[in-house]
């Protein structure tokens, strides 16, 4: 089951305290006006996917082609755009906004982003090499990686040999991070542990591929329009219930008033009969 992921901005790290007193380090991810920009269908494009856009970009900083692309979708220019493969039945309408309730507490997700660049790094920093000895004939090369191969045969350095070189600034995916808490009102997703990238960087969040698909996942996505409709329905139901309660209270009050009036009428009738009997008795005595 494939459904859309989300584009989020890395706000930073903090900690959350649980009810049992334990503290969990979390990374705060924010969904900033995450909307569907385009659809990819099997009939037209050969595959099924949704294209999402997040953030807000200035129109003058957006190319003319992308301005037309966003105008066709009737959305504001977006800062970040990404595609997510989905099943055909999980396509989302263009212009729909996805909320943080797309994921739930306890769910496992995969977060991908661009790692922090370290520049040109040595083998000890880049590959955790131990380095050479501090003495016993070693000079200058204490932090070098040592030999890079064999002799005349094969007479070359094999591809993939761990050596010094550029470190970081690469696409990295951290798998099986657990969602600790979500805040739909502020668009926040808090995941346990660290995610690639620096503060303010963009990351993509997907359902974990190495975990079973959650049964209570919202399909095709947690949409803001659906939440608003549910809220309106709840308000209408609450208003109807309040109206019914008010009508029932009014009916009960009317019944009570009628009962009181009937009791007063019966009491008045009893008094009238008693007065008549007393008058007759008085006349008989006279």
Curated annotation (Swiss-Prot):
Extent of Low complexity compositional bias: 246-265
GO CC terms of this entry: cytosolic large ribosomal subunit
Superkingdom of source: Bacteria
Intrachain S-S bonds: none
BP GO annotations: translation
GO terms of molecular function: rRNA binding; structural constituent of ribosome
Keywords: Methylation, Ribonucleoprotein, Ribosomal protein, RNA-binding, rRNA-binding
Self-association state and partner proteins as the record states: Part of the 50S ribosomal subunit. Forms a cluster with proteins L14 and L19.
UniProt cross-references to HAMAP family, sorted A to Z: Ribosomal_uL3_B
Functional summary from the UniProt entry: One of the primary rRNA binding proteins, it binds directly near the 3'-end of the 23S rRNA, where it nucleates assembly of the 50S subunit.
Name this polypeptide is given: Large ribosomal subunit protein uL3
The gene coding this protein: rplC
